[in-house]
Regions:
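Hydrophobic alpha-helical membrane-insertion signals
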Residues: 1-31
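Intrinsic-disorder/low-complexity peptide segments enriched for small residues
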Residues: 2, 14, 39-41, 62, ...
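Anion-binding and metal-coordination hotspots
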Residues: 8, 56, 67, 74-87, ...
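Basic, short loop/linker segments at the boundary and entry of helix-turn-helix/winged-helix-like folds
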Residues: 26-68, 441
Length: 553
């Protein structure tokens, strides 16, 4: 009978010659791409973050490699990164056998919250230079990401303004009761007067001086009245402190309607993830990203729950980052407004952006409403509409409306003459008098242009790709990479965290594309990044970084 033999098992076996740490790391492992990419990025701006004296800090390239590789593997906790630096060979190799603790890792992230944006810009320019993207086409979409703040820490603008108005009334009534002379001097009976904390402090000081000047008395009634006035002065001080609190709330709100006490940068919005199905609001940010070939090319956070007002600031962010604008923009109907169409037309951007009811118009069974203003015949030369009964609707004026961004829209108003007794009146309109319609000719022209572009061969191609561009990125981000909620408080820290994620996402996507094409990662890494900053490309990035520093100054 044969004897059973096992392979030698000696955990404490020593070797004659020392081994390299990366001997057990495959040549096709994505960790090598991370190492090659970060080694060839320009991190000169990081040096100004460190002091020349004191203990030598960890090298920023090492810290950057470790954090980005952790983000690529869905690890966002500094404590988990610290743990992997002790047990995972990939992290040990990237760190050069260094072991920074979780506090050091977190401090590094917070320290580079401004410079990390330049790193993201450099990486995108590398991708553009190597043909992964062109920066000519921008697929834009947004999603709401919940903040780390508690959901019940809300501050509402309407509540603050209502309570502040009530507080003003209480202050006026109290001042009338305290001292009639001071009340007359400060016009407290005039309800249009607004009290400020500084003015209330002066009044409190004046009242205290007046009370101190009063002579001592033994009369019980006078003592009681004096105690009452002192109590009222203390109450007035409490009102002053409350007024300061309300003013601070309004300053923090800015143009928003709400914010969170624990994360003042977060705004309360309705999220798609609503378990109770009653429209609960949660603190969060509206994350807008631009993608091309499923790479993140730009991103920005907004407090707006809707996407309409975010497009123009997003283009400004793109221009600030790359010193140019894209040639083509593709987005859904949430961005289809007159202001956005006009901005893109004036800046030479070809807009493939849907408008409201575009999909409804493309349905086979769709029939336009014959009584709708857009279905009526319009005589452009004489500027009048013809109603379904054949009578003219002449122009009677222009209506101007102001949007939330301050943009002025103009709508021409047309009125019919004889609507009484019309057999179609019940179907045409139900208001009293003659029918009046409002038509925005400029917006209708933009819609016609958008319809022509969207129905063209190129428009159909872009519409098809829009579904697999930003939507695919959001799907990868939320479900495959478990990035569903921000882990920091404050807009600057949240922006920093997503910049790390965007860098990791783009490198991971690049690795996936190279593997799909059957190319060796280490060979491609050497080809892509060897001498990158010795060529003309170094000048482009240096110019971009210099432009950022000048604008920041």
């Amino acid at each position: 009978m044969a004897k059973l033999h096992f392979r030698p098992y000696i955990p404490n076996q020593t070797v004659l010659f020392p081994q390299r740490i990366d001997e057990n790391i495959a040549a096709t492992d994505p960790v090598r791409i991370v190492n090659a990419v970060i080694d060839n990025l320009n991190l000169e701006s990081f040096k100004k973050l460190y002091k020349e004296t004191g203990r030598c800090p960890y090298h920023p390239k090492m810290m950057l490699k470790v954090i980005i590789y952790a983000y690529m593997n869905n690890i966002y906790s500094c404590r988990k990164i610290e743990k992997y630096l002790l047990r995972d060979i990939h992290y040990i190799w990237l760190a050069g056998n260094e072991h920074p603790d979780f506090i050091t890792i977190n401090r590094f992230r917070n320290r580079v919250k401004e410079e990390i944006n330049n790193v993201f810009t450099q990486l995108v320019l590398v991708l553009a230079d190597k043909g992964f993207i062109s920066l000519d086409v921008e697929y834009i979409d947004g999603t709401k990401i919940e903040s780390k703040a508690n959901k019940y820490t809300f501050v509402w603008r309407k509540t603050v303004e209502r309570n502040r108005t009530r507080l003003m009334d209480k202050i006026r009534i109290l001042l009338e009761q305290v001292d009639e002379a001071i009340a007359q001097e400060n016009s407290i009976k005039d309800t249009s007067v607004e009290f400020t904390p500084c003015r209330l402090s002066d009044i409190v000081d004046e009242l205290k001086e007046a009370l101190e000047r009063q002579p001592a008395t033994k009369d019980k009634e006078e003592k009681k009245a004096l105690r009452k006035k002192k109590k009222q002065v203390m109450e007035l001080e409490g009102y002053r402190d409350k007024l300061i609190e309300y003013d601070n709330h309004l300053d923090t709100l800015g143009e928003r309607n709400s914010y969170s006490k624990t994360d003042p940068g977060a705004t309360f919005m309705r999220m798609k993830e609503d378990a109770m199905k009653y429209g609960q609001t949660k603190p969060g940010y509206n994350l807008q990203i631009g993608t091309e070939n499923q790479f993140i090319t730009d991103f920005r956070l907004f407090p707006n729950p809707t996407d309409t007002l975010t497009l123009i600031p997003f283009f400004h962010s793109f221009q600030y980052r790359y010193n140019r604008l894209p040639n083509i923009c593709v987005a859904d109907s949430g961005y289809g407004s007159e202001e956005n169409y006009r901005f893109m037309q004036e800046n030479g951007i070809e807009a493939f952006i849907k408008y409201n009811y575009f999909h409804k118009e493309q349905r086979p069974r769709y029939t336009p409403n014959p009584f709708h203003a857009e279905s009526l015949h319009y005589n452009a030369q004489e500027d009048y509409y013809v109603c379904p009964m054949g009578q003219h609707m002449n122009r009677i004026g222009t209506k101007r409306d102001k949007t939330a961004s301050g943009y002025i829209t103009e709508s021409d108003r047309y009125k019919a003459k004889r609507c009484e007794g019309c057999p179609l009146r019940g179907s045409c309109f139900k208001a009293r008098g003659n029918r009046i319609i409002e038509v925005n000719h400029r917006l209708n022209q933009y819609k016609r242009q958008a319809r022509e572009r969207l129905l063209s061969e190129e428009g159909i191609k872009h519409r098809g790709r829009r579904c697999i561009e930003p939507e695919a990125v959001f799907g990868q981000m939320k479900y495959n990479m478990a990035y569903r909620r921000f882990r920091h408080m404050g807009e600057d820290k949240v922006t920093m965290d997503f910049a790390f994620f965007a860098i990791a996402f783009n490198i991971k996507k690049m690795c996936a594309k190279l593997i799909k094409e059957g190319k060796g990662l280490i060979t491609v890494a050497k080809y892509m990044f060897m001498g990158l900053f010795i060529t003309r490309y170094n000048w482009n990035i240096a110019t971009c970084c210099q432009m950022h520093e000048e604008k920041a100054a």
